[in-house]
Curated annotation (Swiss-Prot):
UniProt binding sites for [4Fe-4S] cluster: C416, C420, C423
Compositional bias segments (type: Basic and acidic residues): 259-286
Segments forming domain Radical SAM core: 400-644
PANTHER family per the UniProt record, alphabetical: S-ADENOSYL-L-METHIONINE-DEPENDENT TRNA 4-DEMETHYLWYOSINE SYNTHASE, S-ADENOSYL-L-METHIONINE-DEPENDENT TRNA 4-DEMETHYLWYOSINE SYNTHASE TYW1-RELATED
GO molecular function terms attached to this record: 4 iron, 4 sulfur cluster binding; FMN binding; metal ion binding; tRNA-4-demethylwyosine synthase activity
Protein name, as recorded: S-adenosyl-L-methionine-dependent tRNA 4-demethylwyosine synthase TYW1
């Protein structure tokens, strides 16, 4: 064999590999790439299987041996509830709302505006991610409550101060619920509206429209202020849940008319029911924000507001003013239609609403009232209890001879047209200027009033100190004091109620607050008719009585004039409040000449303890000597009158017309049997046989006269002095 041939045969494969080396390299590269891809796929699948097998809460990232938790977006960090309260209602609502917010696992803080400094802390809410809720009440004359006074003052000044600007609170989120009474129509929920407006002017974002609670059960959208708040609270919690999830949508561009647009028509079910249609207007904001419902203010509105903020040509001013007037007319028409509908005062079943709400029933029951039907009540006077024990009667016993243990204190109307600062009923009674509630029949009211009164008397059976004969007498009602609470003359069937009293041989003592002159003129004869004369000037009357009527002074004077034509016994009741109405002697004298009452009761105000609804303190209570001095000075100005009686225990004196002083003796007491005979003759003659106060007067005993050693205390009874004096909780 040829050696050269063998060499070629051995080198041929190597030469072939060399020649095809490119393809070999390519094959190796492809193989390695495939291997790498397979490894990546295997590892990825294994990781996915591992993640599925581990709970989601434990899927943390490991970095250099440390656990790094995934951060979650927080859209709402908490809720701050600010309240401004006078009687405690707003504070109670704040507590209820806080409980609802807590159920969402959100931190919540309740803050009294009296203890909050907006100058230092309000700006913090811009970046805090909190939702701020303001529960604010409207108090006298549309002003804020004492606790919210400084906050509102600061907020108003900041809203109009150019140094703060329109973006000062940009980023702050808020909601407002106002508490008010639509009976005060001119400033209903004014504070809530203002707080809402001022926050918006400073750039804060409203998360939902303003809620409005109404104490007037007739006009309240849901039947009571508590129900109004519950409805608003439900919507707020729903809105808060949406904010927690970070749900967002484009806000309205602000060009919609009357606050209506397609986006909000779809969500109309969520629109706040507590605000009026004329208060629904969307403010321009081009940013992407949380879902919200907006309400408008009368001062700002849509395109008009935008155009007024920019430069306006003089010739365009006329068009703008015409447009503003047109909007105002449309608003008034909507308010009128809304008012006509709301004045019907019907509940969901179409029935006329009752005056007594569940919350009012609870409050009055705690105060010892026995409620009757839907608008009446009866309560046992402390003087009734006193006379059952033989410890003396009230000043009516001293002045007019009533038997205090046989006197039933009641009212057919818990509602009143005033909010007197010295009212000892704790300002829980409803207010109104006319009857708009469901009405009970007088027969039922009288029947249940007597039954409830007798049941309260029965509780004293066997009580130590109670005299058996007086207990038996007390079971038969002989007198009715229509002075418990409210304005009894508002009750549409008051005349029928009085006739029923007289048919039962029960004398009638009716007290009115001098705001219903027509009703006084149309009133049937009563045993004794009182008019409360709490002040002698327009300003002081407004300050003390806080009346609902705008023309309260004219009504007051007309009521006194109506009293002058009454033939039966009439009385002015003056309540002296030191530093408020004790320096108006000449004005009081003029009022006396206007009504020519038979008697004038002058009584020092009774301090009934601290009340958030009144600024009255012990410093306003005059000493008995001061009351005596006032009466002496007043008598000097009214020559036809003299001081007749005194009841030192009640801090009260009686001024009587001289016609009741016969033969040097006073005849201020009442012959009750004679009155019943006269009223029966009056009824039998259909009112033609009239009678006067002198026809049923009786001689006043010596111990009741002014200057007597007894100082008005009946010597038949035993004077009792408590070891620990406590505040009076009720009285005539």
């Amino acid at each position: 064999m040829d050696p050269s041939m063998d060499t070629w045969d051995l080198s041929s494969p190597l030469i072939s590999l060399w020649i095809n080396r490119f393809y070999i390299y390519l094959g190796f590269a492809v193989s390695i790439s495939l291997w790498i891809c397979v490894q990546i796929v295997i590892k990825t699948q294994g990781r996915n299987l591992q993640e599925k097998s581990v709970p989601k809460a434990a899927q943390d990232l490991m970095t250099n041996g440390y656990v790094s938790l995934q951060e979650k977006d927080v859209f709402v960090s908490g809720v701050k509830i600010f309240y401004g309260s006078q009687t405690g209602t707003a504070k109670g609502f704040a507590t209820v709302l806080a409980e609802a917010v807590t159920s969402l696992d959100l931190p919540v803080a309740i803050i009294n505006l009296k203890e909050y400094d907006p100058d230092d802390h309000l700006i913090e809410e811009v970046t805090s991610k909190n939702v701020c809720v303001f529960l604010v009440a409207t108090y006298t004359d549309g002003l804020p409550t004492e606790s919210a006074e400084w906050f509102c003052k600061w907020l108003e000044e900041a809203a109009i101060d150019f140094r703060f600007g329109k973006t000062y609170l940009k980023g702050m989120r808020y909601a407002v619920f106002g508490l008010g009474n639509s009976a005060y129509a001119s400033h209903f929920n004014k504070v809530g509206k203002n707080v809402d407006k001022w926050l918006w002017m400073l750039g804060a974002h409203r998360v939902m429209s303003r809620g409005e609670g109404d104490c007037d059960v007739v006009k309240s959208k849901h039947g009571s202020i508590e129900a109004d708040f519950r409805a608003w609270k439900t919507k707020f919690i729903s809105q808060l849940q949406a904010l927690q999830k970070g749900e967002r949508k484009k806000s309205c561009g602000g060009h919609c008319k009357k606050g209506k647009c397609e986006s909000h028509q779809r969500g109309s079910e969520e629109r706040e029911e507590g605000s009026h249609e004329q208060d629904e207007l969307h403010h321009r904001d081009t940013e992407e924000e949380e879902p919200f419902e907006s309400s408008s203010e009368e001062e700002f509105g849509g395109k008009d507001h935008q155009s007024l903020n920019s430069i306006v040509d003089v010739e365009d001013l006329g068009k703008i003013m015409d447009h503003v007037k047109k909007e105002k007319r449309e608003k008034e028409q909507r308010e009128e239609k809304s008012g006509l509908f709301r004045n019907m005062g019907r509940n969901e079943d179409g029935e006329i609403r009752a005056m007594i709400t569940p919350a009012l029933r609870e409050a009055l029951t705690k105060q010892g009232y026995q409620l009757i039907g839907s608008h009446s009540g009866v309560k046992l006077c402390r003087w009734t209890k006193s006379m059952l024990r033989g410890r003396g009667g009230c000043y009516k016993h001293t002045f007019y001879g009533i038997e205090s243990h046989r006197c039933m204190e009641t009212t057919p109307s818990l509602a009143c047209a005033n909010k007197c600062v010295f009212c000892w009923r704790h300002h829980t009674n409803p207010v109104g200027t006319e009857w708009r509630w469901k009405m009970d029949q007088p027969e039922m009211i009288l029947k249940e009033a007597i039954e409830n009164h007798q049941n309260m008397i029965k509780q004293f059976k066997g009580v130590p100190g109670v005299k058996a004969e007086r207990f038996e007498e007390g079971m038969t009602v002989k007198h009715c004091a229509l002075s418990l609470v409210g304005e009894p003359i508002m009750y549409p069937e008051i005349n029928r109620f009085l006739k029923l009293l007289h048919q039962c041989k029960i004398s009638s003592f009716l007290v009115t607050n001098a705001q219903f002159p027509a009703e006084i003129r149309n009133l049937e004869p009563v045993t004794q008719l009182y008019v409360s004369v709490d002040a002698s000037t327009k300003d002081s009357l407004k300050k003390i009585d806080r009346p609902l009527f705008k023309d309260f002074w004219r009504r007051f004077l007309d009521s006194l004039k109506a009293l002058a034509v009454k033939q039966q016994r009439t009385v002015y009741r003056l309540t002296l409040v030191k530093a408020w109405n004790v320096d108006e002697l000449q004005a009081y004298a003029q009022l006396v000449s206007l009504g020519n009452p038979d008697f004038i009761e002058v009584k020092g105000v009774t301090y009934c303890g601290e009340s958030s609804a009144s600024s009255l303190t012990m410093a306003h209570v005059p000493w008995h000597e001061e009351v005596v001095q006032f009466v002496c000075e007043l008598v000097d100005l009214i020559p036809d009158y003299e001081i007749a009686c005194e009841h030192e225990h009640s801090n009260c004196l009686l001024i009587a017309h001289k016609k009741f002083k016969i033969g040097g003796e006073w005849w201020t007491w009442i012959d009750y049997n004679r009155f019943q005979e006269l009223i029966q003759e009056y009824e039998d003659s259909s009112g033609s046989k009239t009678f006067s106060a002198k026809d049923y007067m009786a001689r006043t005993p010596h111990w009741a006269l002014f200057g007597a050693n007894e100082r008005g205390f009946d010597p038949k009874d035993t004077r009792h002095q408590r070891k620990n004096k406590s505040k009076a909780i009720s009285g005539c």
